[in-house]
Each structure stands twice: as C-alpha cells, then as structure tokens.
C-alpha cells in the first residue's frame, strides 16, 4: 500500500511568515547580494536579521547558515494557513506549486482579472495538501 492510500487525519497547520531584506552572502570570499529578499518564519525573523548582519560586517563578509530557502513541511490531507507579513516598502506575496488553492484568494499573484493577492502589509493564504510529494 502506498503512503497516499493510508487514511489520514486532516488538520490545520498554521505558519506566520515574514519577508525580510538583508544582504545575502553567498560564500566565504564575501560575494553578496546587497538587497537580498528572504521569507522566514516570523519567530525566527529578528534572530536571522541580527546574525546575518553581524556576519556581513566581518571582513570579508561571511554567510549565515540560516539564510536559506524556506521549507514548510505538512502531511497529506492537511490544510495549510499562511499568515504572510510584509513589513517592506513594496508589494510581495508567496506562491505555492503542487498544492491546491483558490486562485481568487490564495494564488499569491497579480495576474489577469483575478483580484490582486499580493500585499503591502498582511494577507492570509489557504492551501490544501491534497497531493503527496515534494514541491
């Protein structure tokens, strides 16, 4: 029996994400992007910003190991609620691949005649983990 055939307990998983802008250092030689954009869990935001800036001020600037792509782990059948905070001075969003969502409210884009689901402050997205896989 494949994993996706087992009965699953559907639950709601909530994540509060925040967009931060920091210099992103790529390697030990100090190569960096001065305007790096990173999505992090809100509870990690201050620590990541503080530590990344501390390492950026070294000579040469050094990478911080927690500056990496955001990975959210959920189970098949879960409903995923994303509270997305954007304290930056531009409209941003988050878009998922591979999960089901309502394109009118949770697509994370501004396309066609659909309402704009980017934000300059706060928005909540709802996604459904109806497919097993890595996306």
Name what the model sees in each region.
Residues 1-116:
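N-terminal, post-signal-peptide metal-ligating segments of extracellular/periplasmic oxidoreductases
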Residues 92, 127-128:
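Glycine- and small hydrophobic-enriched segments that form the cores of compact globular domains
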Residues 77-78, 121-123, 129-135:
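Short tyrosine-centred short linear motifs in exposed loops/low-complexity segments
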């Amino acid at each position: 029996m494949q994993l996706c055939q087992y009965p699953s307990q559907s639950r709601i998983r909530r994540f509060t994400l925040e967009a931060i802008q920091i210099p992103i250092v790529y390697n030990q030689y100090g190569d960096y992007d001065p305007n790096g954009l990173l999505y992090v869990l809100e509870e990690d935001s201050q620590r990541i910003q503080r530590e990344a800036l501390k390492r950026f001020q070294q000579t040469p600037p050094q990478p911080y190991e927690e500056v990496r792509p955001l990975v959210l782990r959920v189970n098949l059948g879960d409903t995923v609620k994303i509270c997305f905070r954007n304290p930056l001075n531009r409209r941003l969003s988050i878009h998922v691949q591979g999960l089901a969502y309502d394109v009118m409210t949770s697509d994370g884009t501004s396309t066609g005649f659909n309402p704009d689901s980017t934000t300059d402050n706060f928005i909540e997205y709802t996604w459904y983990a109806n497919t097993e896989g890595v996306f």
